[in-house]
From Swiss-Prot:
<dbReference type="InterPro" id="IPR027417">
    <property type="entry name" value="P-loop_NTPase"/>
</dbReference>
<keyword id="KW-0067">ATP-binding</keyword>
<dbReference type="GO" id="GO:0044206">
    <property type="term" value="P:UMP salvage"/>
</dbReference>
<feature type="binding site">
    <location>
        <begin position="12"/>
        <end position="19"/>
    </location>
    <ligand>
        <name>ATP</name>
    </ligand>
</feature>
<comment type="similarity">
    <text>Belongs to the uridine kinase family.</text>
</comment>
<protein>
    <recommendedName>
        <fullName>Uridine kinase</fullName>
        <ecNumber>2.7.1.48</ecNumber>
    </recommendedName>
</protein>
<dbReference type="GO" id="GO:0043771">
    <property type="term" value="F:cytidine kinase activity"/>
</dbReference>
<dbReference type="InterPro" id="IPR000764">
    <property type="entry name" value="Uridine_kinase-like"/>
</dbReference>
<dbReference type="GO" id="GO:0044211">
    <property type="term" value="P:CTP salvage"/>
</dbReference>
<dbReference type="GO" id="GO:0005524">
    <property type="term" value="F:ATP binding"/>
</dbReference>
<keyword id="KW-0963">Cytoplasm</keyword>
<dbReference type="Pfam" id="PF00485">
    <property type="entry name" value="PRK"/>
</dbReference>
<dbReference type="GO" id="GO:0005737">
    <property type="term" value="C:cytoplasm"/>
</dbReference>
<comment type="pathway">
    <text>Pyrimidine metabolism; CTP biosynthesis via salvage pathway; CTP from cytidine: step 1/3.</text>
</comment>
<keyword id="KW-0547">Nucleotide-binding</keyword>
<keyword id="KW-0418">Kinase</keyword>
<keyword id="KW-0808">Transferase</keyword>
Amino acid sequence: MGKNPVVIGIAGGSGSGKTSVTRSIYEQFKGHSILMIQQDLYYKDQSHLPFEERLNTNYDHPLAFDNDYLIEHIQDLLNYRPIEKPIYDYKLHTRSEETVHVEPKDVIILEGILVLEDKRLRDLMDIKLYVDTDADLRIIRRIMRDINERGRSIDSVIEQYVSVVRPMHNQFVEPTKRYADIIIPEGGQNHVAIDLMVTKIQTILEQNAIL
């Protein structure tokens, strides 16, 4: 292992293309030591709440996340200690009892809508990205994801977007753009920006005597 792992924070609205950017960067370093951490695995455990109450969870509010737990895990990885990454069950609206064992790596990509909102998280990052995509495209992607991956109905997704996602984006997500070192328009389709990011990451790794 090298001296200091590199932490890359990738933020942006729901459906902005954060995951595509993350995967593109990951693929570029596939032969190296790299891992991905999704912020939405670190929603707070709600097993103590009745199921009906969990249904009202606002997943787009900063208080929905257990950032203390996430920060603890990032700090462990920075010190080359393995973690037991949580799994979140979106159908039961709480944290699963199962975990995934994750070994430390030289590059850590932290991705999520609000990874730039908490200063404690920002202070752990070497590079901060914000993926900026038009709202129309984001809602289409959100609808497709929640229906296909989370078993939601189209009516419930649209209702949630209008009443929760959009106002939370405007209040909490969009303002974090100012903390980004680089703003990437058009998400994973912006190959020029991604190539520049890869070059920057390689430079940091070389400086840290990892590559």
